[in-house]
Amino acid sequence: MRKQTLLRTLFPALAVVAALASTACSLEQNDYCPGTLPPEPAPGERPFRPGDRYTDYGENPFVNTSQAPVSTFSVDCDGASYSNMRRWLNHGQNPPAAAVRIEEFLNYFTFDCPEPAAGHNIALTHEVAACPWHEGHLLMRLGIKGKAIPDDRLPPTNYVLLIDVSGSMAAIDKLELLKTGFSMLVDVLRPTDNIAIVVYSGREEVVLHSTSCEEANKTKIKEVIASLRAEGSTAGAAALKTAYEIASRYFVTGGNNRIILGTDGDFNVGISSTEELVALVEQERERGIYLTVLGVGSGNLNDSMMEQLADNGNGNYEYIDNLAQLEKIFIHERSRFHTVARDCKVQVTFDPKAVAAYRLIGYENRLMDDEEFENDNRDAGEIG
């Protein structure tokens, strides 16, 4: 066999997983619906707002298989980077390089992968083809697809909506967008699902104790959501603790226990460093309570913190830029809020006789030491 020059590029379409129980995505780049939110500005109309915060993880280099034939990394089911990139382009600007996480561009879309066999939670696929941007190289795509669960067979859910109502959320593409999305979610939930709502600005407040989503209660729940207003500073850490306390109080054994945090990530009261907040969610995740993070807005978007909170909180991170994205998250791909596999890791071993070198595309902040693959105590990504 002729040895491939330099590369068998590893392109893990683990992102395929992100769509696991969802219908195919057919969403286009959409403006906000007339009369509800303003249309997107014309290219260049909105000035650059430099307050967004990203972490630049660099780019994975080529690795010689003679020196390190094994590639090990955690799965990642976030999709925020793609819709955030779309927001930048719709505003006539290029996104910062640090805002681009390639694996999340794949996660955003649904791929036509085979369903898992009976009795299995995931299915594995792979493809190898000529690399379209480098002649003589090969591109390998790995696919992992989670088990599809019909809505009527989803386990009961204990949701705690944790909503940022601080002054920074007053922009029309922040709190109002989240309120619309959460109302959509209420409409599709079942009587076996419960919702509690915690809000925070200068202080946290429980505005709705855990309530069954029976039809008779849905109007009340949506009225609470509609009444929310943005004002004050941002005491996010204290509210996060309160949300975990409520989720624990109403914990559903064998169910889906999840906090959904909607914010721009601008925590400025109490614990505010990413490291301290990550330590908090790491303490809580072992109790079986997962954290989904929904980012909104621009100008002070703390993408770096929100991605780390979701990854370490056994959840996922999405960015919402328009109403079509709300429908995608809360209606068409609601199954992402249900985890079907925990602590998922991937390890690929290349034969140095056939492959000279490889490069993992994306997953720069999900790399693992090879020996961690067999370590069940090492946290990794969830499929949901």
Give residue spans per PLM region.
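Bacterial N-terminal signal peptides that target proteins for export
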Residues: R2-A13
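C-terminal motif of bacterial Sec signal peptides marking the signal peptidase cleavage site
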Residues: A21-A24
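An acidic, Ser/Thr-enriched
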Residues: P38-W88, Q93-A99, P116-E127, P132-M140, ...
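Alpha-helix boundary/capping residues
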Residues: L89-G92, F109-D112, L228, G313, ...
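Extracytoplasmic
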Residues: P96-F111
